[in-house]
Amino acid sequence: LRENNNYYNLASYKNNFERYLIEGEFVDKYIDLDFAYLKDLSIIDYRVRLLLFKMIIDIEHYLKIRILNLMENIDEENGYRVVNLYLEKDFNDENYPKKLHNSIFKKVGSEYYQKIFAKYDIDKDKKLENIPIWEFLEIITFGELVNFYEFFSKEYDLKNESKNVFIFREIVKLRNAVAHN
């Protein structure tokens, strides 16, 4: 317990057990609950989350490759156009202006992204532009990727792709649940 989990998480598994409802000395106590069961559930939970996370990472990679492959078959797309349109939309959004811009700017200081950002004039008050799609896809979160995929699908009237947006949104929710217990 001390090395692999904490009491709060372990105790949360007890909610999977029924309680005695009849008045008496056991009322409100869990039926057949044993610490070993909680430990087993914790291990199973960990392994399932690990497996799901690996699958979700593969799905995210698939979506990036899918977008790039679709883009290659669109004559008017050069890898910059749709990203510029999307960043313009984000910058001027009435409800959540600069939401994506702010998310990207938070990453500017990150060692992982420095090579990408070194090429661009990064100013928090200026609109981002002229980032090629193959780099843009690497600096956005999975949720932002799905939002971009939806925009991309609508921009180029890719009806078959638009059908998948709902599924990818559910996968983002699953990813967040897996990552945050």
Language-model features, listed with the residues they occupy:
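Extended intrinsically disordered or low-complexity regions, especially N/C-terminal cytosolic tails and loops
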Residues: 1-172
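Active-site-proximal binding-pocket segments
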Residues: 174-181
